[in-house]
Design a protein with these regions (language model features):
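A generic structural signal for short beta-strands and their flanking turns/coil linkers
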Residues: 29-31, 41-45, 59-63, 70-76, ...
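A short, structured loop/turn motif at beta-sheet edges
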Residues: 7-11, 38-42, 66-73, 95-104, ...
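Short beta-strand segments that buttress and anchor functional surface loops
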Residues: 45-54, 76-83
Length: 205
């Protein structure tokens, strides 16, 4: 779970998180997001996700929006047939809530790994924590951008900056006051603590 209080109108946060081009500008987890033509058998729009890892290696995946209530929440699922991806499939939800200080933006997600016991070990030792903190880093980039820092996206695309942040968080350094924050699992959620059930609801749609 990752959340941030963004000092900006919900309309701006919605636009920059829902538009694929703007999404890539702040989310370090992806290098390309694009709508695909056509829909799946359930009528959901398909999206192509790409992540450049290193030395020309790219991981590919497909996303689907399951349900969207403008300016409030959107649920999605994702999967990858790319053998390089630890993630096999997963689901999540983005939540938007207007607060006195701006917009409370939150995501809850989970996924299934591939490669059996080896995948489970890699996920437990490294990947799940990496994905959690990459999401936290990205939410903080969005928060800074929406707060008026127009260079936040370009500055924070640096892998070196992220690795320094990642190492610091692994060593126990807390997020800066007011910055995006994250947790693994449930039990420490904040004011939107009743919302994790929304992910379960989306699975039954």
């Amino acid at each position: 779970m990752v959340e941030a209080l963004i000092p900006a109108p919900v309309e701006l946060v919605w636009q920059r998180s829902q538009d694929p081009v703007l999404h890539v500008a702040w989310d370090i987890r992806f290098t390309r997001i694009a709508y695909l033509t056509g829909k799946d058998e359930r009528g959901y729009h398909l999206m192509d996700y790409r992540t450049a890892v290193a030395f020309g290696v790219e991981v590919k995946g497909v996303g689907r929006y399951l349900h969207t209530t403008p300016l409030r929440h959107s649920t999605f699922e994702f999967d990858s047939s790319d053998w390089k991806s630890i993630i096999r499939d997963g689901r999540g939800i983005w939540l938007y809530e207007v607060r006195p200080g701006g917009t409370w933006f939150k995501t809850i997600y989970d996924y299934q790994h591939r490669r059996g016991v080896l995948g489970r070990l890699l996920d437990w030792l490294f990947f799940r924590r990496l994905l959690q903190l990459a999401t936290e880093w990205s939410f903080e980039t969005l928060r800074l951008w929406c707060a008026g820092d127009e260079r936040a996206g370009a500055r924070r695309r640096s892998r070196l900056r992220f690795l320094v942040f990642f190492a610091g968080r692994l060593l126990g350094l807390p997020p800066a006051p007011g910055a995006a924050r994250s947790w693994l699992g449930r039990g420490r959620e904040s004011q939107l603590e009743d919302q994790p059930a929304a992910v379960e609801v989306s699975r039954r749609r």
